[in-house]
């Protein structure tokens, strides 16, 4: 394990470093929200149909968009949630881990809310790349209609290439993400400035009264339009999830200095263009540019959407890693793609599942216009979950009274529920897709957690207290196991009981090592555990010791490195004369268990698909001994 300082939450120590991290945040954190101008205003205009949209409605729509950005992104995320961190880390599961420690009475409720938020985020990780890249590549149709039939194949090809290079890591190219996205935001702002003068009446959008008046006059149509207006803030969850990568200061600076002004200017420019040229409602973003600039803008937009997609994919990898370490999912293979950056990881199973999902969505919907109807539910749902968890965080971590927390967060929750309600009207048009994805992932995580709990209860009935076992083997008798030289390390989840693999070793091999270490690996409710707190050793007798290794939910659980650190600090053992004993369970579904039969089978399938603990914990393969047992659950 690298020293904890290597992967501590990011902090800028000087101005050049602060500027570099700010530019980096522009590329990674704001890539998704930066691609929203491609389709958000266009989709908001769509419910008004072929009769066209009135001037007051255009101003009202832009006003809604600007104030949604201000309230949801600026107030909730940039100013409020970026302060709600778990030792510098943000994100739904990071917040959940902290709350499960601070408020254990509500563990089940918060667990359900947390895995719902995580499941919705993974659904978003499938939809965002498909929608963003399709939106950008569709600009080619304005360059020449001949590209019409090639938009989908080109988009799918880009996605296949993007997911194919994940195993190589993004360290070499990620240095370009920030500068390219910065150029993208500058182009957004410049395009907006160039068109605001088309009709200065659009500046009335700064007045929130126009947003309220629009909703009041539009009635049910206005409520439906909220679903499209919400597209302006998709990607806001990335601000919070990437808190540990860049730190609060650079993320806030990037928003106020570059991103918010650029988005504001661009939406105002699109609105002014539609006011002066009503026919531009078909594609107000790309029609802002002259013909000679279309191809460069399409290429830049494609690059921006690829970067946005990369940020979402990386976020999904990080989220799944957290879920594994917190015990919400079985162990998947985790590959580290950088020798210096522990946060750069690649999960083959997750990568392949995301790619399959993205391609299926692209072929199902065929265009960004159709896919936009499926978008929004996952994002609004995740935001609602985050607000609920933030309410508990404010009470338990900051000591806010219930009244204060309600006064601050209830208006936000009500607003987000309105957006969620508007998006739910899209269910029949494709909105069912993120619900199905989230439902499947929630069921998977709930099944795994419940199955592991039932398995522990089942095996606990047969457990022998470690103290009782030690007393038994210390007795001199003709049936005592033969002592052999060397050290044996037995992995177990319950240090007070005798590991089943130790009992099996004595039963079948009739031997006991000279030194026996009962090893427990704990995942703390914090992102990273400092090296000084990595382990504790307790000597129980001349033959037995207890060793506990502690890792954070963002740590690489490298047991070999941790043991090497223990050896440096006085824990005497020789790795080449040490054997690691692991238990391998063959699970059998029972007719009567704590889970329905289908869930039993799902849990067993997940357990069978989990990566070998030897590989996951980085144990030396030639020193590992596995003993199996059959367990009926």
Swiss-Prot record:
Q: Which GO terms describe its cellular component?
A: plasma membrane
InterPro entries, sorted: K+_transporter, K_trans_C, K_trans_N, Kup
Pfam families of this UniProt entry? K_trans, K_trans_C
Q: Coiled coil: present as a keyword of the record?
A: no
Quick one: signal sequence residues? none
Describe its function: Transport of potassium into the cell. Likely operates as a K(+):H(+) symporter.
Name by which UniProt lists this protein: Probable potassium transport system protein Kup 2
Organism from which the protein derives: Sinorhizobium medicae (strain WSM419) (Ensifer medicae)
User: Where is the organism placed in the taxonomic lineage, from the top?
Assistant: Bacteria, Pseudomonadati, Pseudomonadota, Alphaproteobacteria, Hyphomicrobiales
């Amino acid at each position: 394990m690298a020293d904890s300082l290597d992967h501590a939450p990011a902090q800028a120590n000087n101005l050049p470093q602060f500027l570099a991290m700010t530019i980096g945040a522009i590329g990674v954190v704001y890539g998704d929200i930066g691609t929203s101008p491609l389709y958000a205003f266009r989709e908001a205009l769509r419910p008004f149909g072929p009769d066209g949209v009135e001037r007051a409605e255009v101003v009202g729509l832009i006003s809604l968009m600007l104030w949604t950005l201000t309230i949801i992104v600026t107030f909730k995320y940039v100013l409020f949630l970026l302060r709600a961190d778990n030792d510098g880390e943000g994100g739904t599961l990071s917040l959940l881990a902290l709350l499960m420690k601070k408020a254990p009475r509500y563990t089940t409720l918060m667990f359900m809310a947390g895995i719902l938020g995580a499941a919705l985020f993974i659904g978003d990780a499938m939809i965002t790349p498909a929608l963003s890249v399709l939106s950008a590549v569709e600009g080619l149709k304005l360059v020449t209609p001949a590209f019409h039939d090639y938009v989908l194949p080109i988009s799918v090809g880009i996605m296949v290439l993007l997911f194919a290079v994940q195993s190589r890591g993004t360290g070499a190219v990620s240095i370009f993400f920030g500068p390219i996205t910065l150029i993208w935001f500058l182009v957004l702002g410049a395009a907006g400035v160039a068109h605001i003068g088309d009709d200065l009446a659009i500046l009335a959008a700064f007045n929130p009264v126009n947003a309220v008046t629009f909703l009041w006059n539009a009635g049910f149509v206005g409520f439906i339009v909220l679903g499209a207006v919400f597209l302006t803030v998709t990607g806001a969850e990335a601000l919070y999830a990437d808190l540990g990568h860049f730190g609060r200061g650079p993320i806030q600076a990037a928003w106020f200095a570059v991103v918010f002004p650029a988005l504001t200017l661009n939406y105002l420019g699109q609105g002014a263009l539609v006011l002066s040229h009503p026919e531009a409602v078909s594609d107000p973003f790309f029609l802002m540019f002259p013909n000679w600039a279309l191809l460069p803008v399409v290429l830049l937009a494609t690059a921006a959407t690829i970067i946005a997609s990369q940020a979402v994919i990386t976020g999904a990898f990080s989220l799944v890693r957290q879920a594994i370490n917190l015990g919400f999912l079985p162990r998947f293979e985790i590959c580290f793609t950088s020798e210096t950056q522990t946060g750069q990881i690649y999960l083959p199973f997750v990568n392949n599942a995301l790619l399959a999902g993205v391609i299926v969505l692209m072929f199902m919907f065929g265009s960004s216009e159709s896919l936009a109807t499926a978008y929004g539910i996952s994002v609004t749902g995740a935001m609602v979950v985050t607000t609920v968890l933030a309410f508990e965080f404010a009470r338990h971590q900051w000591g806010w009274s219930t009244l204060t927390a309600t006064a601050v967060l209830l208006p936000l929750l009500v607003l987000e529920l309105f957006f969620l309600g508007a998006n739910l009207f899209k269910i029949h048009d494709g909105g069912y897709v993120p619900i199905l994805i989230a439902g499947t992932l929630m069921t998977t995580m709930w099944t795994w957690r419940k199955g592991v709990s039932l398995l522990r209860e089942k095996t606990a009935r047969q457990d022998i207290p470690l103290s009782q076992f030690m007393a038994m083997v210390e007795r001199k008798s003709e049936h005592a196991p033969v002592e052999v030289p060397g050290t044996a390390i037995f992995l177990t989840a319950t240090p007070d009981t005798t590991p089943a693999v130790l009992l099996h070793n004595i039963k079948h091999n009739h031997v006991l090592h000279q030194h026996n270490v009962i090893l427990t690996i704990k995942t703390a409710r914090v992102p990273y555990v400092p090296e000084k707190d990595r382990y504790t050793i307790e000597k129980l007798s001349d033959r037995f010791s207890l060793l506990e290794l502690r890792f954070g939910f963002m740590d690489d659980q490298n047991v070999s490195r941790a043991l090497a650190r223990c050896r440096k600090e006085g824990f005497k053992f020789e790795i080449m004369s040490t054997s690691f004993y692991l238990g391998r369970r063959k699970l059998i579904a029972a007719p009567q268990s704590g889970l329905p039969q289908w869930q039993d089978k799902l849990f067993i399938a997940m357990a069978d698909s989990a990566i070998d603990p030897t590989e996951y914990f980085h144990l030396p393969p030639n020193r590992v001994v596995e003993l199996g047992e059959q367990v009926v659950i």
